Amino acid sequence: MFKCPERVSIKKKEDILDLPNLVEVQIKSYKQFLQIGKLAEERENIGLEEVFREIFPIKSYNEATILEYLSYNLGVPKYSPEECIRRGITYSVTLKVRFRLTDETGIKEEEVYMGTIPIMTDKGTFIINGAERVVVSQVHRSPGINFEQEKHSKGNVLFSFRIIPYRGSWLEASFDINDLIYIHIDRKKRRRKILAMTFIRALGYSTDADIIEEFFAVEEHSLRSEKDFVALVGKVLADNVVDADSSLVYGKAGEKLSTAMLKRILDAGVQSLKIAVGADENHPIIKMLAKDPTDSYEAALKDFYRRLRPGEPATLANARSTIMRLFFDSKRYNLGRVGRYKLNKKLGFPLDDETLSQVTLRKEDVIGALKYLIRLRMGDEKTSIDDIDHLANRRVRSVGELIQNHCRSGLARMEKIVRERMNLFDFSSDTLTPGKIISAKGLVSVLKDFFSRSQLSQFMDQTNPVAELTHKRRLSALGPGGLNRERAGFEVRDVHSSHYGRICPIETPEGPNIGLITSLSSFAKINEFGFIETPYRVVRDGIVTDEIEYMTADVEEDCVIAQASAELDEYNMFKDSVCWARYKGEAFEADTSTVTHMDVSPKQLVSVVTGLIPFLEHDDANRALMGSNMQRQAVPLLKTEAAIVGTGLEGRAAKDSGAIVVAQEDGVVEYVDSYEIVVAKKNNPTLKDTYPLKKFLRSNSGTCINQTPLCSVGDVVTHGDVLADGPATDKGELALGKNVLVAFMPWYGYNFEDAIIISEKLIKQDAYTSIYIEEFELTARDTKLGKEEITRDIPNVSEEVLANLGEDGIVRIGAEVKPGDILVGKITPKSETELAPEERLLRAIFGEKAADVKDASLTVPPGTEGVVMDVKVFSRKDRLSKSDDELVEEAVHLKDLQKEYKSQLAQLKMEHREKLGALLLNEKAPAAIIHRRSADILVQEGAVFDQETIELLERESLVDLLMAPCDMYDVLKDILSNYETAVQRLEVNYKTEAEHIKEGDADLDHGVIRQVKVYVASKRKLQVGDKMAGRHGNKGVVSKIVPEADMPFLANGETVQMILNPLGVPSRMNLGQVLETHLGYAAKTAGIYVKTPVFEGFPESRIWDMMIEQGLPEDGKSYLFDGKTGERFDSKVVVGYIYMLKLSHLIADKIHARSIGPYSLVTQQPLGGKAQMGGQRFGEMEVWALEAYGVAHMLQEILTVKSDDVSGRTRIYESIVKGENLLRSGTPESFNVLIKEMQGLGLDVRPMVVDA
């Protein structure tokens, strides 16, 4: 069996932590959303379950009818993912929901079909209408509370806060220039500001005394004589001072005490006063109390309502329901667990599960936020403003959450329909059941819309395995509820210190999306709140332990974190007394005794793709960015070859991308061919795992997916071993390009501007040859004029052209085709009205059949050549047009199918009985087993299981059994659940097969009788104009393919395979390519593979030592000889092995020519672009160039007859046919368009004859 090449490394010890599963982000999120495989009562209140519980129960307006949700049940997929791609359909399961309806007639329960839900493949993708798609995770501003500051034009700093819910109205509060706090509700309505004091009263703090008590500590002071005045003058009252007998008010809460006031109070016989500690007349709360126009709860509510809804009558009931709806109704306002967590953390409230489940706003939250805001204004050191670009304030919405939000809106639509149907239902004529009032359309259409149209549901980039993997790990700040690329500023796009180990600082696209689309770092995970976590080793008492702690960005702020490269002694203690560390996002030299944590690996900073670049630490960041992005564009080659110089991540990237086949369990290989591998399990050799291999499938980007086995019969395999290679992999390692012998030197000017010169030897060896597969599709429909027909009998086509078509009119597999060749012959009925009267007469006389159909065949488009490698035909069977023989044959097939189904079902039952027997027979029941519905005790606690009891359990379904939690119940649950799923799958397969025998391919689109798909494979060799690149952002275009004899050669006669321009290195500052060249040469000569992980790679000295060991020049430079003259070049040249990739920008796809073609309807000018068979625009600047030369006739020809002079075009055609050399140009059509536009503006422009 092939093993991955053992790579040599200078790394002293391996990483303490292995990389997590790289597509876990997708799989885990969707698993939580659907909770497949869990019993209804075991499901947690998350995902789809949460949405149903939120929307239901639905009550009618009079509350006489109630519809409750009980549970949902997911079916099994009808076809495999590969079959769905082949048929062009969605990989999904049925969703059935059990409802309970209570009305005046009684209680009814029913399971209602609610449509289908797309499910994720085990690679983390969805198949929608036959195309693989990925739902990208979205980074958005976290719900919660944010404190901000802005500078006023007068120079004052104004503080504010914002409470952002997950769903609902935003609540903002900000200081104004007079130190008063105003509340804004919803940003769109900024002008409607409400004084914070009014809002506090509207929340239920009615009197001034209540409000003061909330914000200040209250002390009681005695007032016996005038001696006490000194301590009290200037203090603020916390409560009204009232004469008990006459109810006369001597002082109001919030008033400042003066000597006169104190004298009056003393005279009235009041003996004690309540004083607000720390309050003075400049305190914002005291200022607002004075400013507040309201003085009671009712008045405040009405004032609040008036400002929010000016012009509407402000009644108490209206006002109360408005404020309740805005912030205290969980259907309209929801902070979410995340929002509640962030808010409680910031304001110092408890973080236990009970408080986190409180999703609406509380009065305490508003008071707490205002207190914090005032402390911030007063300059309290314990308060701080928030940085909105910090990852503590940005969270990730993964697939599950995005789909959950869409399901919520779909079910909310359905809720309205259900309510209306409840009200309009006529109980006298019919009985009401859940199925009659529930419409599944809302949910289905919302899901369909999300998967096919959402900005975050993207067609998967499948150029190579790395592109696939990166796409699933991508984070986007765009999309609904996110940012807009036009409005996103520099700060959002920039690298932030909190990104360390969470978001890769390098991998992001160039162009308008820079910084908005990023990638998860290699070790990063997403926690339950959606925040990105990264792992660190815990340091205790100066000892670096092997304990791993995953930390979010806000927790990390309080830790001192050492780098992974810090040296440790044999006791895992720091060797030096100081080391480089990070604290609050700043790097500094820290005393090792203060260090609390340590990085797990130097590569935790970067993403997987960036981690595949060797000597990344020697490359400029801009070039590393290009290198990361270009690896994703590398085309899988016909002959793959692993890189000599790797980073050690190649195997892991290939495994997690799903490109290769990996053993799921230990076992022995029993059978191998190019289509499947069968492995007998180690613990039970009678059970076998079958691994089907993908053969010559077309990827989303047209490249070829092909898996080849690496194992042989009899090989012993363990879990995780590579069984088969896939596209762009070599022995289980990623292999995107080729190791090529390169020289950095100029060569006759051909490598000017980064161009690349290659040897013809690479072409002969098929080194950079790749296979592309094109899919062409043709459908025959039932039209108004009759059925379209797929046939070989096409009117007015010679037999020569039809040579490659079979009898059924479809091209034979293996035929070589070129542009214009017919792939599938099709004729379409033609409308009678198209005929001229004389033609109709001729047809009536001669009865010509060919004239009533037109040729609508599928032909090869321009620019495509290749070999037909596969043909797929899907057709519907018409029940009525079947002959007797066909009906008999169908019956025989169905009988055989039923027989096969029954035998497989019997086999399943037998295996199920054996498993139950192995688990239970003669064992004691650790707990009683009870029937859930009838409440009968099936097995008593302590009873011994006999064969009869086992048979009894065998007949029951898992849903109906109840048992106290124990190990036996867990295994029993697994056995019953697996059996039920297997039976369900068998049943679906049987029904699908039977349907296929009776009706053919019933899932074809409406009106389609037959569908043919033809796959054409073309072999693309490397040619001049193709784009190539290394892994360091060193890209270029092939400028010349030189005969091997003319290439420069080394002293030993070996010719160089590729020449690169040395001027491409100094200004680009990507020295990694030079180091890779040297190390590659040394490793190739030694016959070894090396790995140089990012930030801990081979030092220069070690490379020179290896060069000397292999007898290579120690400076890495060699003398080369000119292949043309045989003379030695003057200077020494850097020669070595570098890993070069061929990118998917192939010249064959870009080159294009037009002789005749379509014209734009309005301007009558040729269209633009290859897809439209367009022309090359001769623009304004090109016209200037011709004007500069004074070539008037040429200019006139280009601007008229070659473009949009309609009549002139016809005339020039005639003159060419007649052989005349004549140009009579007319008016360009675009001139007429200009005149019409001016007339449209009311300017009467027309030619006029003026007498001279």
From Swiss-Prot:
Name this protein carries in UniProt: DNA-directed RNA polymerase subunit beta
Catalytic activity: RNA(n) + a ribonucleoside 5'-triphosphate = RNA(n+1) + diphosphate
GO molecular function: DNA binding; DNA-directed RNA polymerase activity; ribonucleoside binding
EC supergroup of this enzyme: transferase
Protein function: DNA-dependent RNA polymerase catalyzes the transcription of DNA into RNA using the four ribonucleoside triphosphates as substrates.
Subunit record text: The RNAP catalytic core consists of 2 alpha, 1 beta, 1 beta' and 1 omega subunit. When a sigma factor is associated with the core the holoenzyme is formed, which can initiate transcription.
Family: Belongs to the RNA polymerase beta chain family.
GO cellular component: DNA-directed RNA polymerase complex
Keywords: DNA-directed RNA polymerase, Nucleotidyltransferase, Transcription, Transferase
PANTHER family named among the record's database cross-references: DNA-DIRECTED RNA POLYMERASE I SUBUNIT 2 (PTHR20856)
UniProt keyword Transferase, yes or no: yes
Domain of life according to the entry: Bacteria
Native organism: Chlamydia muridarum (strain MoPn / Nigg)
Gene Ontology BP terms: DNA-templated transcription
Signal sequence bounds: none
EC numbers, comma separated: 2.7.7.6
